[in-house]
Design a protein with these regions (language model features):
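RNase H-like, Mg2+-dependent phosphodiesterase core
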Residues: 1-207
Length: 207
């Protein structure tokens, strides 16, 4: 894990040259068979360090929950947005992910002066942006966004499980685990499944 001071280096450097509000953005759920893709954008307070903020995939679930609550409590601004399965099926997961990130960024108040992105450039933003390779491991703002997005989506998938427990969304969060695929083979699609995500060996008989 990268030390926290090192993960703030880029953000601090950008503030020194005039970018007062530096946002990080990230998304989760790209590879799932069910549920939305969820994006979060976060502007961290420059004087409030939150220890152990790192890539959400590297943080245990209970610790993610704790960090999520600290991030949203102390951030200058934060926002989440999503693209639902119907939108994903209509425009593809890549475009839906970009739209979710764009929505999250534009929901921030105040709007950031610059956005740090982990991978692809987010279209149609009115502010500067900068790509940071492996940003969720190298940049606190992106790592914080990763945690907020992950916890938000996990909570949503648990809610979806409460509405329809047949698929086990509380366990696999919509990913293509063996028990999830078995449930789809048995019960068919639910209204939160992405019909464009179709492992053909299993799903060709489900139409």
């Amino acid at each position: 894990m990268v030390r926290v001071p090192a993960m703030r280096t880029l953000e601090n450097a950008l503030r020194r040259v005039g970018f007062m509000y530096v946002a990080g953005v990230d998304e989760v759920g790209r590879g799932c068979l069910a549920g939305p893709v969820v994006a979060a954008a976060v502007v961290l307070h420059p004087d409030r360090h939150i220890p152990w903020v790192s890539d959400s995939k590297a943080v245990p679930a209970l610790e993610r929950e704790r960090l999520h609550d600290r991030i949203v409590r102390h951030a200058v601004a934060w926002a989440v947005a999503s693209a639902e399965p119907t939108e994903i099926d209509l425009i593809n997961i890549h475009q839906a992910s970009l739209r979710a990130m764009q929505r999250a960024i534009l929901s921030l108040a105040p709007l950031p002066d610059i956005v740090l992105v982990d991978a692809f450039r987010v279209p149609e933003l009115p502010m500067a942006q900068r790509g940071v390779r492996h940003g969720d491991r190298r940049c606190s703002a992106i790592a914080a966004a990763s945690i907020v997005a992950k916890v938000t989506r996990d909570r949503l998938m648990r809610e979806l499980h409460g509405r329809d427990p047949r698929y086990g969304f509380d366990r696999h969060k919509g990913y293509a685990t063996a028990d999830h695929l078995e449930a789809v083979a048995r019960f068919g699609y639910s209204d939160v499944h992405r019909r464009s995500f179709r492992p053909p060996t299993l799903f060709d008989t489900l139409d």
